[in-house]
């Protein structure tokens, strides 16, 4: 992949839908009918889809208290909520025979010194408090049984968060937790560990747990020096770390589908706008805090029982609401054709998981609104659909901003050159003609030739240009 980190950006970044004419390496495609011009000022607002409720007000309270954007607050909250709901309930498909766990993978990034740990610990607080109460009571009963010389075979109230663990290390804990794992951290190390980014360059990255834990799939491992696990695995991931954690996930997915399972939230930093002083302090409303603590405490007590996922009761979705999900899938599928707006591997992978993400978000929203087990009210399906639609759009712009799709100023210069029929379209001809004019003149002289090579190679990899191997002449695929 071309390194575009320090390349200047142009204004019209990469919204063009590419058509491949006959005679090239790719088949001709129909332009994506709804591909809109790129708007780099797209602002994600997930909260607008959620109707007024105590949970929404609490999320906004925590966002205001920590002065971290509300999208991040919402998704960190849902990540922690899912860490306990995952061990309590599932959500069933329309045939009622298959199900999805309530688990979510949430990856958020924020600036240094913005209170990321504060936000995470705020949402985890009732989990920790309940866990301590359960463990204290367990130890008291155990001590009483020993004093009375009675047998004591109660299962330990098993619930905890891992903050930095390798897949191999996590594998050892699965038998004890009946296949559940729960990861949460405000540090980059978690993302490095689960993606293998912290491994040596020649090390093998094991993403099996990461991939299978999302859907509650079967996992079997045999370790030469460690205990293995065989059975279904279900996991949750909540990470709010410094800027760069999203890049870590994107760079280390390796086409496995790992990144497509995540909610990637990269809210802008408001560090320069933060207000300090007692008059600017804000704390959650007592009623909002109390409702959140009560629901999470009850869920944590139930989650600590560690029932196998096959034994968990389920929420379900009404037929009319399934029709809404199917309608969204039919709407989005037209963007998946070659050259379509969401036709790149990452966006395609996210799009085809629309139903799964909607199911997972909706059941967690319903549970946090005190909805009893059974039918999920339509308002939470509508909210999850709206959230997913906007999230997908935000990832589209995020990938453009990070140079993974679309074009930058250097690439635009090459495209313009290849579009000039009076020029000989070789790499050396381009270097002679353009290396001393902007944007190329802004680059240091040393290594400029390599940047030109990388830019041509990157455009070829994106399917925007191709090279005649016999003549060395480049041609636009458009």
Predicted features along the sequence, with ranges:
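Phosphate-handling catalytic cores of nucleic-acid transaction enzymes
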Residues: 2, 9-478
């Amino acid at each position: 992949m071309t390194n575009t980190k320090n390349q200047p950006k142009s204004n019209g970044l990469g919204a063009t839908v590419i058509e491949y004419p006959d005679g090239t390496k790719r088949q001709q495609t129909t332009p994506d009918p709804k591909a809109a011009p790129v708007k780099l000022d797209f602002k994600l607002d997930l909260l607008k889809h959620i109707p007024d409720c105590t949970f929404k007000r609490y999320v906004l309270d925590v966002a205001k208290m920590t002065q971290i954007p509300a999208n991040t607050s919402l998704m960190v909250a849902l990540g922690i909520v899912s860490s306990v709901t995952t061990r309590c309930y599932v959500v069933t498909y329309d045939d009622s025979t298959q199900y999805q766990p309530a688990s979510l993978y949430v990856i958020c990034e924020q600036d240094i010194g913005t209170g990321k740990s504060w936000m995470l610990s705020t949402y985890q607080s009732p989990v920790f408090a309940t866990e301590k109460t359960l463990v204290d009571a367990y130890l008291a009963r155990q001590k009483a049984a020993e004093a009375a010389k009675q047998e004591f075979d109660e299962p330990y109230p098993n619930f905890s968060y891992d903050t930095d663990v390798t897949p191999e290390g996590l594998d050892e804990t699965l038998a004890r937790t009946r296949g559940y794992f729960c990861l949460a951290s405000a540090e980059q190390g978690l993302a490095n560990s689960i993606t293998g980014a912290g491994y040596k360059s020649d090390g093998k990255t094991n993403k099996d747990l990461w991939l299978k834990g999302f859907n509650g799939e079967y996992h079997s491992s045999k370790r030469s020096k460690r205990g293995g696990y065989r059975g279904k695995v279900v996991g949750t991931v909540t990470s709010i770390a410094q800027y760069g954690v999203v890049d870590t996930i994107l760079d280390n997915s390796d086409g496995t589908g790992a990144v497509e399972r995540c909610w990637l939230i990269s809210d802008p930093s408001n560090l320069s706008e933060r207000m300090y002083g007692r008059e600017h302090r804000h704390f959650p409303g007592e009623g909002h805090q109390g409702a959140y603590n009560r629901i999470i405490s009850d869920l944590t007590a139930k989650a600590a029982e560690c029932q196998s996922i096959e034994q968990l009761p389920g929420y379900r979705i009404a037929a009319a609401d399934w029709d809404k999900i199917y309608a969204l899938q039919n709407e989005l599928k037209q963007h998946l054709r070659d050259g379509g707006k969401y036709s790149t591997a990452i966006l395609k992978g996210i799009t085809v998981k629309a139903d799964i993400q909607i199911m997972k978000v909706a059941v967690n929203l319903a549970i946090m609104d005190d909805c009893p087990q059974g039918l999920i009210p339509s308002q939470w399906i509508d909210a999850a659909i709206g959230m997913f639609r906007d999230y997908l759009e935000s990832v589209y712009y995020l990938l453009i901003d990070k140079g993974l799709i679309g074009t930058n100023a250097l690439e635009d210069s090459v495209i313009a050159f290849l579009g000039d029929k009076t020029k000989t379209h070789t790499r050396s001809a381009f270097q002679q003609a353009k290396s001393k004019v902007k944007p190329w003149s802004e680059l240091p002289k040393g290594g400029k030739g390599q940047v030109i090579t990388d830019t041509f190679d990157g455009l070829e990899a994106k399917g925007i240009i191709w090279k005649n191997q016999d003549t060395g002449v480049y041609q636009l695929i458009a």
